[in-house]
């Protein structure tokens, strides 16, 4: 890391899919700050926030699968970068426009119309609304898709709308 930074080849360092213990272990071997952690996150992959919403409950959402990486990242000023934000499951497909998720897509369409956006734009706005300032890795090189998603950066969903989408994605609130 030191040589990469010193030579100017890398300005900032981060990790991917690491929990707090793994980040701390890596920090014992490098001097450069770890500023980013790329994690799967989106409306159909909400585990990172579920445990915080379901504290002291006994339902599936209350189980901590990542050792509190969201809280750790916020405390340590590590930016989370959401990869595959439009996927459901582990690369099972895209949820936007998918007939398997009629309730979610109905809500995405509703808010897209309200905010003069697209369902994909609203899915990004949902991520952007989280107070952790999560960055979205959109994974496209198609200019029209980049423009549609970039336009969503101006959308600020109301808190009730954020939770409405969270529940439409199949999540419950305690």
Q: What annotation goes with each model-predicted range?
A:
Residues 1-174:
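Beta/alpha (TIM)-barrel catalytic core signal, keyed to glycine-rich beta->alpha loops juxtaposed to Asp/Glu
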């Amino acid at each position: 890391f030191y040589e990469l930074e010193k030579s100017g080849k890398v300005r900032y360092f981060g990790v991917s899919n690491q929990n707090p213990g793994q980040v701390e272990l890596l920090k014992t071997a490098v001097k450069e700050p770890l500023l980013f952690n790329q994690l799967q996150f989106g409306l159909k992959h909400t585990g990172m926030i579920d445990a915080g919403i379901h504290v002291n409950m006994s339902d599936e959402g209350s189980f901590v699968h990542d050792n509190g990486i969201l809280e750790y990242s916020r405390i340590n000023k590590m930016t989370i970068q959401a990869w595959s934000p439009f996927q459901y499951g582990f690369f099972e497909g895209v949820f936007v426009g998918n007939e398997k998720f009629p309730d979610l897509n109905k809500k995405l369409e509703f808010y897209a119309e309200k905010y003069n956006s697209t369902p994909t734009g609203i899915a990004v706005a949902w991520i952007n609304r989280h107070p952790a300032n999560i960055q979205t890795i959109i994974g496209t090189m198609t200019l029209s898709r980049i423009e549609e998603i970039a336009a969503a950066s101006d959308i600020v969903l109301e808190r009730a709308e954020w939770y409405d989408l969270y529940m439409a994605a199949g999540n419950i609130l305690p």
